[in-house]
């Protein structure tokens, strides 16, 4: 509904970090989502996504990092999925292999890893990279085990990688 969207816009302007997918980012920034289908190459499409993230960042009430998650570029020879962070330091693009199946909960898991990394002192850019790697390994493991997409992904055995990465970050600072 329009009231819900207005409320989400107001709430998202107050956050330090937001992680919308591209459709959500377009809705929050009043960007025409139909324009996303106008692009014939990955670079132009990714530029559209980063411009949308920058527009959202500019709408924030204060400093904000915007991470558009799960941007799928299937027009490339090898399809990839991207996460695009726009911060005060600029645009950071992280890509990973695009699997041919979607799994429940991966967006929530990405946001949780990002949040945990940020709380532990990582930059948003480093957190985006680590969250992407974490999901890649977890999804690959899940695909090998033939798990139903509705059952989520096998991420538990990769939690130690997150713990080690955040411990290294803390040592470095």
Where are these regions (language model features)?
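Phosphate-handling active-site elements
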Residues: 91-92, 117-131
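Short pre-catalytic strand/loop immediately N-terminal to key active-site residues, enriched for Gly-Thr
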Residues: 91-104
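Charged C-terminal helix
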Residues: 125-173
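Short Gly/Pro-enriched loop/turn and capping motifs at secondary-structure junctions
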Residues: 73, 100, 135
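Conserved phosphate/ATP/ADP-binding segment of small-molecule kinases
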Residues: 1-91
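Short, small-residue alpha-helix embedded
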Residues: 101-124
């Amino acid at each position: 509904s329009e009231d819900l969207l207005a409320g989400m816009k107001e709430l998202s302007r107050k956050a330090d970090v937001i992680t919308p997918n591209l459709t959500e980012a377009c809705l929050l920034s009043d960007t025409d989502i139909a324009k996303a289908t106008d692009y014939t190459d990955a670079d132009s499409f990714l530029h559209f996504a980063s411009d949308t993230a920058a527009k959202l960042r500019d709408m924030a009430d204060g400093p904000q990092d915007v991470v558009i998650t799960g941007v799928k570029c299937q027009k490339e020879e090898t399809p990839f999925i991207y996460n695009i962070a726009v911060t005060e330091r600029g645009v950071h693009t992280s890509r990973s292999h695009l699997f041919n199946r979607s799994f429940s909960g991966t967006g929530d898991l990405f946001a949780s890893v990002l949040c945990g990394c940020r709380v532990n002192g990582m930059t948003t850019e480093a957190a985006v990279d680590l969250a992407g790697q974490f999901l890649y390994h977890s999804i690959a493991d899940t695909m090998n085990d033939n798990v139903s997409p509705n059952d989520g992904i096998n991420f538990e055995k990769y939690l130690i990688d997150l713990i080690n990465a955040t411990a290294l970050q803390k040592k470095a600072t």
